[in-house]
Amino acid sequence: MRVALILLPFVVVLLGAAEKPSVIVVTGAPGTEEYGQDFAKWADQWKAASKKAKATFRQVGKAKKGDPKDDLRKILAKESKKSPQPLWVVLLGHGTYAGKQAKFNLNGPDLEAGELAEWLKDFERPLVIVNCASSSSPFLNALRAKGRVVITATRSGVERNYCRLGGFLATAIGDSTADLDKDGQTSLLEAWLIAARRTAAFYEEEGRLATEHSLLDDNGDGKGTQSDWFRGLQVTKKSAEEGLLPDGLRAHQFHLIPSANERKLTAEQRAERDALELELARHRSRKTKLKDEEYYERLEEILREMSRIYFPDNQGNSNIE
């Protein structure tokens, strides 16, 4: 009994640690000292944001020796596959594309899109994959899956020049001024929209031809959507596939640094809320196909289910302000 009591605090600590979000930042082969400084700075910004988020942060590729690809494989192998907490994988560096093969350049063997897809295939937890490298577009289709958010710095494999999206995104992800809907937290969608627009502005102000056009995919079709297809937080172009929600909805549910109110929800409550928000979006998209009575009846049901998350005692009392 005494042993159990002594061990209990350690068990609680371990369980708490397992419930943290995870952020894995991979810095690639820089090529030049200047690029190396950029990638290191961006990684430090992700580290600072992760600290604010109270997330577990790990960086791969910082050491000049070793095999960073194998290090990443081992880290992912140890990650929980079904945690309710999100896993963020961020690639900062250069990429290459030859034929049909896209790679992320590392000090040592390069990382192929198919390899990363294989390592992540059994993950059922919330998952964000951001490839800020040149020629990164093929990673989008290779890594697409239901419930995932995949971002690439380019819209094609032939956009081979150094990409600046990574720097703007590293800044925006921890920037409260990127909170476009003013809900007290910056979502991945908001950070990406700001970063993509700042990237485009850079080329325009410098009088250069833009050599990178970022894509975001979170509906699993692997096609991706550009930032200029959005008006505010809404996509202006609908998917050609019947019943498929537009990109952006899932990305808007990911917040690396959650607000005070968001932190009051458990991971399970957030997962339930997120599922209901997506169901609400699907239902609204079917409005013209339903009778008014049927539409509003189901709409009320969804909203009631959402309200129970914030007001579980049904008495109007909640920790959410």
Regions picked out by a protein language model, each given a short descriptive name:
Residues 44, 128-227:
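Active-site-proximal C-terminal subdomain of hydrolase catalytic domains
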Residues 34, 45-85:
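Functional beta-strand-loop-alpha-helix junction segments that form "active/interaction loops"
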Residues 26-30, 60-63, 90-94, 107-108, ...:
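Active-site-proximal beta-strand/loop segments in catalytic clefts of secreted hydrolases
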Residues 3-13:
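Sec-dependent N-terminal signal peptides
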Residues 19-23, 53-56, 82-87, 123-128, ...:
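Loop/turn elements at helix/coil->beta-strand transitions in domains of secreted/extracellular proteins
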Residues 18-34, 172-179:
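Cell-envelope and extracellular/periplasmic
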Residues 94-123:
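A short, glycine/acidic-enriched catalytic loop
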Residues 9, 16-24, 36, 208-321:
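Disordered regulatory segments flanking catalytic cores
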